[in-house]
């Protein structure tokens, strides 16, 4: 299998941006390879080497997690970066509109973490609504989710460690099993780390993989990827309308979104198949 040299990995080189899954078309490597991809903060270190036809950049993380300098430079003086790469991959549609050399791809961690353990399936639904929220508070998006979890904690089953809630899954690893917090539920409140066009993560697709309807705050363009009859956009007071009857009325959309997730590639396979191979 082909190998691609990566720089600045925000994930383990043995796997991919999607938990412990691996790309279908190539393996990542830290050793010298013909194809090179500079990721997130390393995009600037790539400016010190000459452009070639197999040299790419990838903004893998969200706007907050990836260095702001990369995005700010693209908005102010895009040639400073683009002149050194064949293409730059990102989920940020605002950046994609700047230049044809900036190619949209899924964000890192776009597929369900559960895919590393088992396939998508419609699980038995015995509970109404959950929410997963970690105690992380180092970004505006984290703090917004924490605040909303505090407001909603008496109206749903809260998991993730925030506000004294249970952390689902075994151990202390980065990719804990969320089954306890997702599988038995009809609905789950999902707040992404940020809200901008093109950005969604496993927080959303974890729900679709187990037949859960997300109560969603995140990508304004999410209808371009999923059936909106199987998504409820978060609004104040929306939890009061959640019932088993409502869930059952959306079964077709639930199954449709599950199939869409089953057929969705990880970010790496998407940009490799469309722009590199």
Q: What role is predicted for each listed range?
A:
Residues 1-59, 63-158, 162-277:
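Pol beta-like nucleotidyltransferase catalytic core
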């Amino acid at each position: 299998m082909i190998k691609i040299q990566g720089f600045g990995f925000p994930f383990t080189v043995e796997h991919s941006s999607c938990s412990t899954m691996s790309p279908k078309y190539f393996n990542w490597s830290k050793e010298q390879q013909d194809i090179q991809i500079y990721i997130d903060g390393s995009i600037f270190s790539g400016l010190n080497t000459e452009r070639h036809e197999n040299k790419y950049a990838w903004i893998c993380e969200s706007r907050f997690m990836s260095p702001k300098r990369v995005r700010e430079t693209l908005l102010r003086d895009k040639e400073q970066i683009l002149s050194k790469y064949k293409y730059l991959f990102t989920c940020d549609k605002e950046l994609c509109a700047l230049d044809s050399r900036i190619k949209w791809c899924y964000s890192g961690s776009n597929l369900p973490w559960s895919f590393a353990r088992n396939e998508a399936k419609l699980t038995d639904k015995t509970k109404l609504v959950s929410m997963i929220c970690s105690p992380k508070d180092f970004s505006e998006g984290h703090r917004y989710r924490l605040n909303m979890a505090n407001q909603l904690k008496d109206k749903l089953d809260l998991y993730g460690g925030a506000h004294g809630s249970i952390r689902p899954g075994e151990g202390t690893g980065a990719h804990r099993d969320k089954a306890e917090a997702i599988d038995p539920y009809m609905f789950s409140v999902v707040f992404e780390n940020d809200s901008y066009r093109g950005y969604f993560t496993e927080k959303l697709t974890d729900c679709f993989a187990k037949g859960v309807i997300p109560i969603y705050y995140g990508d304004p363009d999410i209808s371009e990827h999923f059936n909106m009859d199987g998504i409820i956009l978060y609004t104040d007071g929306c939890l009061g309308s959640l019932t088993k009857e409502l869930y059952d009325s959306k079964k077709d959309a639930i199954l449709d979104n599950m199939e869409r997730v089953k057929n969705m590639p990880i970010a790496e396979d998407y940009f490799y198949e469309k722009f590199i191979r």
